[in-house]
Amino acid sequence: MFRGASAVNLDSKGRIAIPTRYRPEILEINQGQMVCTVDIRQSCLLLYPLNQWEIIEQKLSKLSNFNPEERSLQRVMLGYATECELDSAGRILISAPLRQHAKLEKSIMLVGQLNKFEIWSESEWQAQIEKDMTLGASGQFAMSEALSMLSL
């Protein structure tokens, strides 16, 4: 399970270091294999351990190629999906198209989301968090049925 936000740096070759606390799980369960793709709604990337990505792939494969929205989701998520592997220093390489999509520069935020990470440029992350906090504080947060049942 991945949780918390970590500030990491993108090196000149397009690599980021996965925080040490997550490496054993990724190595033990997935032999260091991960998949990175785009988030279709926000300018961040989604980084999955291989076993979690395979669950997403199964769900995507069940969508209809004849439904334009479903086909679009398949095209983008699968089209950008890039396999990556932790190297001996615990780094992964993020491809140039993925870096461009998420506007990644040197300062990156790696944000745990239980079964995956979100990868944000630091400036985009700060803007998104500010937006999320403002929305929550304003009381204009649209409650889905699942959210209305959630007790924290």
Curated annotation (Swiss-Prot):
Keyword Repeat: yes
Compartmental location: Cytoplasm, Nucleoid
MF terms in GO: DNA-binding transcription factor activity; transcription cis-regulatory region binding
GO BP term, example: negative regulation of DNA-templated transcription initiation
Superkingdom in the source lineage: Bacteria
Entries under InterPro entries matching the protein: MraZ, MraZ_C, MraZ_dom, MraZ_N, MraZ_sf, SpoVT-AbrB_dom, SpoVT-AbrB_sf
Residue stretches making up the SpoVT-AbrB domain: 5-52, 81-124
Alphabetical keyword list: Cytoplasm, DNA-binding, Repeat, Transcription, Transcription regulation
GO CC, alphabetical: cytoplasm; nucleoid
Assembly information from the UniProt record: Forms oligomers.
HAMAP family: MraZ (MF_01008)
The family this protein is said to belong to: Belongs to the MraZ family.
Protein name (database record): Transcriptional regulator MraZ
Organism (species): Histophilus somni (strain 129Pt) (Haemophilus somnus)
